Every structure is written in structure tokens, then in C-alpha cells.
A protein has these predicted regions:
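Iron-sulfur cluster-binding electron-transfer modules in prokaryotic oxidoreductases
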Residues: 1-277
Length: 277
């Protein structure tokens, strides 16, 4: 439940500050926020930014970065809002298909119309795009066709991307970690490179996009195997130079951070490089 998640996370944030919770965990961010950064979205807009549940509570700064990038591209943004709730991805991962379908129907009912629905979490994006298959209805298929990863949408609209005014700074090297839900499920991982190109030197891993070990709920159900898979990914990161890592999925980011990697969302790098003058 979104409200329980919000208040539970605030209690965890207090627990972290009191030293009652370990910071080095793949189950939650190293520093949970007590306050959510203020949104600049409007009540009407050209696109809907899907906020979800875990992402909205644990990584709201990514949503704010997405808003900043889209607005800098000349795009007006509105948020999906609390009535939309969870996309149902974790329910589907756990085999709770009926509950996943209920979540999917609620999401669709809360987002009628034709506005593009942009997502900044690869796992959520993959789930939303799968609604046509999950529900098998015309409504679900039409809804899924409205869904795009934020970076995918920007890459499809280069004229918008070109409008973003950037600071004149050096392009630091960053390692791109492709979430499975972006590379294999959505097959739009190249968009991350197009979006990052003007602000960073993209460093590729040599493991051909192998999983980091997070895998949705996989790291909870099979922690030992998950850590072995993560070890392989961390070795690939070391071979690539141990630069800052960018990942477009919260589960991957948390999982790699717990192993010592410095990880941010690609949109955070782009937002940071925007010239606000």
C-alpha cells in the first residue's frame, strides 16, 4: 500500500539516522529521505510521468531529475499521482498473476486518454508495456503502446533533446549498466547512450549486458545466487575502470550500491549538466 510504504520508509529513515538499520543493504537506499523533494510538474501536460510506489518513495530525486530534463526539452509534465499506485511488476515476478492483473487494471483506469506515459524505472516500464499480454484486452494493448522509458522517448524526439541547454563542462567517464528490463525486455537500452552522449564519456562493460543479480524479487528469494551474479558484474565494472555507474533501474542501483559501487540514474547526470541560467 503506497501510504504504508511512505510512512514505513520514513520510520526506516529515522532508524538509519539512529544507527538502528544497516546502511549497506541491497534492500533499501543507503540514506532514505525524510522529506521528498518538491515536484515542479503541473496538473496538465503533454506527457505523464509514471511515479509508481517504491521509486516514488525511495528515489524521488530521480523523478525530479526526469521532470527537470523533460521541462528543459520544452515538454510539459504531469505526474501519474497517488491513485495510480503500483504497476504490479513485483506481483508478477512472484507469480501473483491475479494481483498483478488487478494492479494493471487500476493503473489503466487512473490514466485514461492518449498522453504518452513516460517511466524512469526500467522494471516498471517493462511491466506497463506488458499489460497487453498480461490482460489480453484491446484496452491493455492500446495502453501499453503509450508507454515509453523517458530516455527512449527523448531519443525518439531528437528535436526535444536538442533544446536542452547544457553547461560547458568536461564529459566525465561513466559506466553504463544495462538493466535486463531495459535491454532485454524493452530493448531500448541504446537510448541511454544517446541521452548521455552530450554530457558523459560512455564506458561499456565487456559482459554483453549480463544480469547484475537483482532481478526484481530474485535477490530476495535467492540471495546467495544473487550475490554470486553481482560479484561477476562488479568484476566487469572493475575491468572497465571503476568509474561512476549509471543504471536506469532502482533494483539494479540498490544491488550494486550495496557492493560498493557508486551508482546514479542516467537522468540525474543529464539534469545535473543542464544550464539553469
Amino acid at each position: 500500500h503506497p501510504r504504508l510504504l511512505l510512512w514505513g520508509s520514513r520510520a526506516m529513515a529515522v532508524g538509519q539516522r539512529l544507527g538502528l538499520l544497516p546502511r549497506n543493504s541491497s534492500l533499501w537506499p543507503k540514506k532514505l529521505s525524510l522529506r521528498r523533494p518538491k515536484s515542479t510538474a503541473t496538473s496538465t501536460g503533454e506527457v505523464v510521468l509514471f511515479t509508481g510506489c517504491v521509486m516514488d518513495t525511495w528515489m524521488p530525486e530521480v523523478h525530479r531529475a526526469a521532470e527537470k530534463v523533460l521541462q528543459a526539452s520544452g515538454t510539459t509534465v504531469m505526474l501519474s499521482g497517488p491513485t495510480t499506485g503500483c504497476c504490479g511488476a513485483l506481483h508478477e515476478h512472484a507469480g501473483l498473476t491475479d494481483q498483478a492483473r488487478q494492479r494493471a487494471q487500476q493503473v489503466m483506469d487512473s490514466l485514461p486518454g492518449q498522453h504518452p506515459i513516460l517511466v524512469d524505472a526500467a522494471g516498471c516500464g517493462a511491466a506497463l508495456k506488458n499489460y497487453g499480454h498480461l490482460l489480453g484486452t484491446q484496452q491493455a494493448q492500446e495502453f501499453a503502446e503509450r508507454v515509453f522509458d523517458v530516455q527512449e522517448w527523448l531519443a525518439k524526439h531528437p528535436e526535444r533533446l536538442a533544446k536542452i541547454s547544457l553547461k560547458e563542462t568536461e564529459r566525465p567517464p561513466v559506466i553504463v549498466q544495462d538493466p535486463c528490463h531495459l535491454r532485454h525486455a524493452q530493448q531500448c537500452h541504446e537510448a541511454v547512450r544517446e541521452v548521455l552522449g552530450p554530457v558523459a564519456q560512455v564506458v561499456e562493460l565487456d559482459d554483453e549486458g549480463l544480469c547484475c543479480g537483482a532481478g526484481g524479487s530474485f535477490s530476495l528469494v535467492h540471495p546467495d545466487l544473487s550475490q554470486e551474479v553481482r560479484k561477476r558484474k562488479m568484476e566487469a565494472i572493475a575491468r572497465a575502470g571503476n568509474h561512476e555507474v549509471v543504471s536506469a533501474n532502482p533494483g539494479c542501483a540498490l544491488h550494486l550500491e550495496a557492493a560498493g559501487a557508486k551508482v546514479r540514474h542516467p537522468l540525474e547526470l543529464l539534469a545535473e549538466a543542464i544550464d539553469d541560467k
